[in-house]
Amino acid sequence: MSTSRKLKSHGMRRSKSRSPHKGVKRGGSKRKYRKGNLKSRKRGDDANRNYRSHL
């Protein structure tokens, strides 16, 4: 079980870099920072991360 858990954690961390799942998570803020600038994009990402954390 411990190994499985470790693998899962690793997979999540690795997929965070580039994975279709991120597309869905980024989809919401995509519209946001699409209107704004690069700075807004960083802020949106942070907000999204916090929002997901709260969920």
UniProtKB/Swiss-Prot annotation:
Region labeled Disordered — which residues? 1-55
Main location, first listed in the record: nucleus
Quote the InterPro entries the UniProt record gives.
Nuclear_transition_prot1, Nuclear_transition_prot1_CS
Q: Which UniProt keywords apply?
A: Chromosome, Developmental protein, Differentiation, DNA-binding, Nucleosome core, Nucleus, Phosphoprotein, Spermatogenesis
Nucleus as a keyword of this entry, yes or no, is: yes
Localization terms from the record: Nucleus; Chromosome
Bias class Basic residues marks the residues at: 1-42
| One record GO biological process | sperm DNA condensation
**Known function:** Plays a key role in the replacement of histones to protamine in the elongating spermatids of mammals. In condensing spermatids, loaded onto the nucleosomes, where it promotes the recruitment and processing of protamines, which are responsible for histone eviction.
PANTHER family assigned: SPERMATID NUCLEAR TRANSITION PROTEIN 1 (PTHR17486:SF0)
Official protein name in the record: Spermatid nuclear transition protein 1
Q: Which organism's genome codes for this protein?
A: Homo sapiens
Q: What is the lineage of its organism?
A: Eukaryota, Metazoa, Chordata, Craniata, Vertebrata
